[in-house]
């Protein structure tokens, strides 16, 4: 019996050390060496202060800023430790009610905007933490942001255009605008005036 237990325990200890220590440390070390920004969470630092991550959406409630997609991480919006979709099916009345409330809130924030509300401004992403919106969603909000900041709409739309990222490799995904990067650029342009 000892002939069976001893090799099993040695193999268990060896594989535990290999897969539980050596492999994670090697992968983490390689990631930090090859991709230092991404390995640290793609943090955005401004003036020595971390202001967010380019990978995690944030709650911008100020109407002078662009708003991202709704968060599905209730009851704490944009909580990265609670990432996950809302799990509401397309026929669920709760989803229809939530979308209706979000449309009403967008209309109340910009009563003069009669354009159709882009779907990504009223529905959460699969993770509930999407940092990006479509260019259509950004342009939908541009008039409100320009009016509240006293900026020409052309300047705000140009800022949106300059922050629009093409699909990955030209075909994977859709064009997108990172809300944090756009709002930081907007704040920087306002501070430069």
Curated annotation (Swiss-Prot):
Transmembrane segments: 7-27
Pfam families linked to this entry: KdpC
Record InterPro entries: KdpC (IPR003820)
Disulfide bridge partners, by residue number: none
Keywords: ATP-binding, Cell inner membrane, Cell membrane, Ion transport, Membrane, Nucleotide-binding, Potassium, Potassium transport, Transmembrane, Transmembrane helix, Transport
GO molecular function: ATP binding; P-type potassium transmembrane transporter activity
Protein name in UniProt: Potassium-transporting ATPase KdpC subunit
Gene Ontology CC terms: plasma membrane
Location relative to the cell: Cell inner membrane
Summary of subunit composition and partner proteins: The system is composed of three essential subunits: KdpA, KdpB and KdpC.
Function according to Swiss-Prot or TrEMBL: Part of the high-affinity ATP-driven potassium transport (or Kdp) system, which catalyzes the hydrolysis of ATP coupled with the electrogenic transport of potassium into the cytoplasm. This subunit acts as a catalytic chaperone that increases the ATP-binding affinity of the ATP-hydrolyzing subunit KdpB by the formation of a transient KdpB/KdpC/ATP ternary complex.
Lipid bilayer topology: Single-pass membrane protein
Record bears the keyword Cell membrane: yes
Superkingdom of origin: Bacteria
Protein family: Belongs to the KdpC family.
Organism: Variovorax paradoxus (strain S110)
